[in-house]
Amino acid sequence: DNIGKLLKTLDEMGIADNTIVVYVSDQGYFLGEHGFFDKRMFYEEAARMPFVIRYPKKIPAGKRLKDLILNIDFAPTLAEFAGVKMENVQGHSFTGNLEGKTPADWRKEIYYRYWTNHAIRPAHFAIRSERYKLIFYYAKNLDMTDTENFDFTPAWDFYDLEEDPHENHNLYNDPKYAPIIRQMKKDLLNLRKEVGDTDEKYPEMQELLEKYYK
């Protein structure tokens, strides 16, 4: 109701077409899905963030993006709409995407990492494309505080989000997906290098990757 009041006021003031309105929040929370509460694990319920934007002068109403957007893209996008170009930032403006002109080189995959290590949610990193998700649970404390020591065999999860949108079936050992998984492992390494998250200062991680990255 209050959002409606805000939009109505902008209309009454005659500035709606020249005002950007954004509705956004933090990541979602688990409410029992996968046996979890809170967030942190890289399932869709906790990985996604709502982002609704209205800017009549530039953005067609009713449009829904399928492009992979990260929260580091928010600031460059709003800055560009305001006529400011941000430099030396990790995010990318998606003004073109919102206007229906997604760049040909727009990201096809995203990288995720959760560092803190607990038995209920082991430390992990992951890659997600529009359709597939690959997660590696390495379960090492490294230099993190607020961690636990526990016995855990490193493991992979792989989900086909088109066939299994609720991520109930780990298909990592399904031979049908072996070629896709091999390629995503390569892409995951490339993304880790791209963002400077290669664990070079952790010899135990290098040994772990050599053993399980097959």
Regions found by a protein language model. Name each.
Residues 8-60, 70:
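Histidine-centered active-site microenvironments of extracellular/periplasmic hydrolases
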Residues 1-4, 47, 69-76, 92, ...:
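A structural signal for well-ordered alpha-helical segments within the folded catalytic domains
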Residues 55-58, 83-84, 100-102, 130-132, ...:
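Short loop segments at secondary-structure junctions
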Residues 3, 20-25, 50-53, 74-79, ...:
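Beta-strand elements within well-structured catalytic alpha/beta cores of enzymes
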Residues 30-33, 38-40, 119-121, 135-136, ...:
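Short catalytic/ligand-binding loop motif for oxyanion handling, primarily in non-cytosolic enzymes
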Residues 16-19, 61-127, 170, 177-182, ...:
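Polar, surface-exposed loop/tail segments
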Residues 153-155, 163, 171-214:
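Long, internal low-complexity/basic segments
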Residues 124-157:
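Low-complexity, glycine/alanine/valine/leucine- and proline-rich hydrophobic stretches
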